[in-house]
């Protein structure tokens, strides 16, 4: 398990919940985790995903984020810094999708 730290705490939905980090399942022996990703993982390994919001909303949001991050990583198997540059926009996009989904429920 590794944890990718967001560049800043991202306000989610109602304003009482923040995403501080995203947990990502990657085998510990994966040699493609190099450079900056390794540094981030070591520094923030103990950071928890801290959210105080409806569980179903959180699950939808994380599913959207993880799908986008997995696509990002498959395009950048060397785990370059683009993953970090794009992380905020990935989460912002996921939040918008989840908010639209909530309006349609």
Where are these regions (language model features)?
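Eukaryotic intrinsically disordered, low-complexity regulatory linkers and tails enriched in Ser/Thr/Pro
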Residues: 1-105
